[in-house]
């Protein structure tokens, strides 16, 4: 008998069943996974993130490959203490949106420092990286605009594009991107090309210099989501733009504080005029409470460490290159990754479940 394997994709929104029916079907799937001992999601951790973690189902610590804390800054004493000191000074929360009173001086300081770090004029903060991408795109693009997107961009960006026109380009396909830019010229008010700096799905990089040239040639704006690049790429950790020597040549850079900074939150950095507009029209900022004082202070300290301690980035790359080398020696297919995002592709559904 042919075995049937299901994935989470099989239980996405379907118009054939109502919400309760879909939830019931999905619960049966989860029950089967648990019965088979294949629980892969929502696993309880009893420690913070690190190279090893203590999790449910294991009596001893296990080696961890699940976190994005690239530089280990979530566990540095300096970042912890900065957060503690901020709580003592400001309290546990801003308790208001930034636009109406939750805008602390350390929020302003972080905006200025992160904007300068990624080579932009100004920045706006968000409570999550997801909110940064989704919020700014909802604010900037409407029915008379179009987004030209790489198929591997983050889901958070896709969430912000539901009210505008979308055209998918091939992954790093410069020829097709140019073709589409020619086709849409003069048809839309705003043309925005959206790419990642480092693509987490397969670990490769965007062809940023060439894409910048195409955007300038065909008068399109460019948004770079550098969630996996900032803190990691470039001689000083300033991201994919620094790696390619393209700082200051990108219209909008977005990022998250949940990866190299070891915390939580997100930002967008752009020209002063664009940021001023977003501070009033990016709904995920305007209608969300500001980041907590602890989070903001810890991020500021993390940014300070990233600037002053290049050796932690060097160590990350040493570990990355060692793991890549050993995996290849053992015959694993890790694709075309050139970043700390290493992908292992297994040959069968059965292997993927192990």
Can you describe what each PLM-predicted range is?
Residues 206, 300-338, 342, 346:
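Conserved PLP-dependent catalytic core of the aminotransferase class-I/II
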Residues 81-128:
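Conserved N-terminal alpha-helix of the aminotransferase class I/II PLP-enzyme fold
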Residues 128, 149-163:
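Substrate-binding/gating loop at the entrance of the active-site cleft, primarily
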Residues 69, 171-224:
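Active-site phosphate-binding strand-loop segment of PLP-dependent enzymes
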Residues 136-155:
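Conserved PLP-anchoring active-site segment centered on the Schiff-base-forming lysine
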Residues 236, 242-277:
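Active-site PLP attachment segment
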Residues 1-10, 23-90, 220:
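N-terminal "arm"/small-domain region of PLP-dependent enzymes with the aminotransferase-like
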Residues 344-354:
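Single conserved hydrophobic/aromatic residue that forms the stacking wall/gate
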């Amino acid at each position: 008998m042919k075995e049937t394997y299901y994935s989470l994709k099989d239980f996405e929104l379907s118009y054939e069943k109502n919400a309760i029916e879909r939830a019931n079907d999905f619960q049966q799937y989860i029950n089967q996974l648990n019965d088979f001992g294949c629980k892969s999601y929502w696993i309880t951790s009893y420690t913070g993130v690190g190279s090893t973690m203590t999790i449910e189902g294991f009596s001893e610590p296990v080696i961890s490959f699940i976190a994005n804390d690239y530089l280990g800054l979530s566990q540095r004493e300096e970042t912890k203490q900065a957060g503690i000191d901020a709580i003592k000074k400001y309290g546990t929360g801003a308790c208001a949106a930034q636009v109406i009173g939750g805008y602390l001086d350390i929020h302003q300081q972080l905006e200025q420092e992160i904007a300068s770090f990624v080579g932009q004029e100004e920045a706006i903060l968000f409570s999550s990286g997801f909110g940064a991408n989704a919020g700014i795109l909802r604010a900037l693009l409407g029915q008379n605009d179009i987004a030209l997107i790489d198929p591997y961009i983050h889901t958070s960006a896709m969430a912000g594009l539901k009210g505008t026109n979308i055209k998918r380009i091939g992954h790093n396909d410069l020829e097709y991107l140019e073709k589409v830019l020619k086709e849409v010229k003069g048809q839309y008010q705003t043309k925005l090309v959206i790419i990642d700096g480092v693509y987490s799905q397969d670990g490769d990089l965007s062809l940023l210099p060439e894409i910048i040239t195409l955007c300038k040639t065909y008068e399109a704006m460019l948004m770079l989501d550098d969630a996996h690049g900032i803190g990691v790429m470039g001689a000083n950790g300033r991201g994919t733009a620094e790696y390619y020597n393209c700082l200051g040549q990108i219209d909008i850079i977005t990022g998250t504080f949940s990866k190299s900074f070891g915390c939580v939150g997100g930002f967008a950095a752009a020209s002063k005029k664009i940021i001023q507009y977003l501070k009033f029209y990016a709904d995920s900022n305007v209608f969300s409470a500001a980041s907590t004082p602890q989070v903001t202070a810890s991020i500021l300290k993390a940014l300070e460490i990233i600037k002053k301690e290049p050796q932690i980035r060097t160590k990350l790359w040493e570990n990355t290159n060692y793991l890549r080398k050993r995996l290849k020696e053992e015959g694993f297919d890790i694709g075309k990754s050139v970043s700390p995002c290493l992908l292992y592709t297994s040959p069968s559904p059965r292997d993927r479940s192990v």
